[in-house]
UniProtKB/Swiss-Prot annotation:
GO molecular function: 14-3-3 protein binding; chromatin binding; DNA-binding transcription factor binding; histone deacetylase activity; histone deacetylase activity, hydrolytic mechanism; protein kinase binding; protein kinase C binding; protein lysine deacetylase activity
Keywords, comma-separated and alphabetical: Chromatin regulator, Cytoplasm, Hydrolase, Nucleus, Phosphoprotein, Repeat, Repressor, Transcription, Transcription regulation
Reactions listed under catalytic activity: N(6)-acetyl-L-lysyl-[histone] + H2O = L-lysyl-[histone] + acetate; N(6)-acetyl-L-lysyl-[protein] + H2O = L-lysyl-[protein] + acetate
Top-level division of the source organism's lineage: Eukaryota
Name listed for the protein in its UniProt record: Histone deacetylase 7
Length: 238
C-alpha cells in the first residue's frame, strides 16, 4: 500500500508469534449481521427466562404436597410388607423420624445437665383406687349372705374359760416346793423313834436291882408302851 511504512525485519531466533492479518472490509460487512443476530437471540432468551420465572414459582408449592403423598405411600408399603420381607434399607421417612428422636434425647440430656434438680419427665398424680369396695361387691355377688350373729351370747352357749396367770402360779407352787432341798439337820421320817432317857436318880438311892440289871436303866419307849419290862417282871416273881 502506498501509505504503509516498511516494517523492520525480525532477527530473533526461535518461535515467532503469529501475526494476524488485518481484517478485510468484506469480512467486516459479513460479521456485522451475524453479531446483530446473536445479540437479538440472547435478548430473546433472557426475556423467555424472565417470563418462565413466575410460572416456576407458581408450580413450586405443590412439590411439598407431592413429597407428602410419596411419604404416605412409602409408609403404607412398609406397613403392608411382611416381617420376613422387610428390607434393612431405611427410607427417608424413617431416617427423618430417627433424627427427630435422637434430637429429642439430646435435648433431654442437655436439660438434665443444666437443671439436674428438675424432673425430666412430668409425672401425673394418680388418685387412690377404691379396691376394697370393688372387692366387697364382687364377693357379695358370689357368696351367700351370712346371718349376723347376736352381740350377747345365749344362755345355752357358755363361754370358754381361760386359765389366768395367778392360777398358773398356784398350780406350779407345790412343784417348786417339792423340788427344794430338805434341811439335812431334820430327822428322816423313815427313821425309828428316838429312845427316851430316864431321869437321873439321887446318889443315896442305890438298889441292887438297879445295879444288877444295867439294861433296866435304858428302856425303849416301845417296851414301856407295849408291855412291862421282862427284867422287872422276873424280879417281882423272885
Amino acid at each position: 500500500t502506498p501509505g504503509s511504512q516498511p516494517q523492520p525485519m525480525d532477527l530473533r531466533v526461535g518461535q515467532r508469534p503469529t501475526v494476524e492479518p488485518p481484517p478485510e472490509p468484506a469480512l467486516l460487512t459479513l460479521q456485522h449481521p451475524q453479531r446483530l443476530h446473536r445479540h437479538l437471540f440472547l435478548a430473546g432468551l433472557q426475556q423467555q427466562q424472565r417470563s418462565a420465572e413466575p410460572m416456576r414459582l407458581s408450580m413450586d408449592p405443590p412439590l411439598p404436597e407431592l413429597q407428602g403423598g410419596q411419604q404416605e405411600q412409602e409408609l403404607r408399603q412398609l406397613l403392608n410388607k411382611d416381617k420376613s420381607k422387610r428390607s434393612a434399607v431405611a427410607s427417608s421417612v424413617v431416617k427423618q423420624k430417627l433424627a427427630e428422636v435422637i434430637l429429642k434425647k439430646q435435648q433431654a440430656a442437655l436439660e438434665r445437665t443444666v437443671h439436674p434438680s428438675s424432673p425430666s419427665i412430668p409425672y401425673r398424680t394418680l388418685e387412690p383406687l377404691d379396691t376394697e369396695g370393688a372387692a366387697r361387691s364382687v364377693l357379695s355377688s358370689f357368696l351367700p349372705p351370712v346371718p349376723s350373729l347376736p352381740t350377747e351370747p345365749p344362755e345355752h352357749f357358755p363361754l370358754r374359760k381361760t386359765v389366768s396367770e395367778p392360777n398358773l402360779k398356784l398350780r406350779y407352787k407345790p412343784k417348786k416346793s417339792l423340788e427344794r432341798r430338805k434341811n439335812p439337820l431334820l430327822r428322816k421320817e423313815s427313821a425309828p423313834p428316838s429312845l427316851r432317857r430316864r431321869p437321873a436318880e439321887t446318889l443315896g438311892d442305890s438298889s441292887p436291882s438297879s445295879s444288877s440289871t444295867p439294861a433296866s436303866g435304858c428302856s425303849s419307849p416301845n417296851d414301856s408302851e407295849h408291855g412291862p419290862n421282862p427284867a422287872l417282871g422276873s424280879e417281882a416273881d423272885g
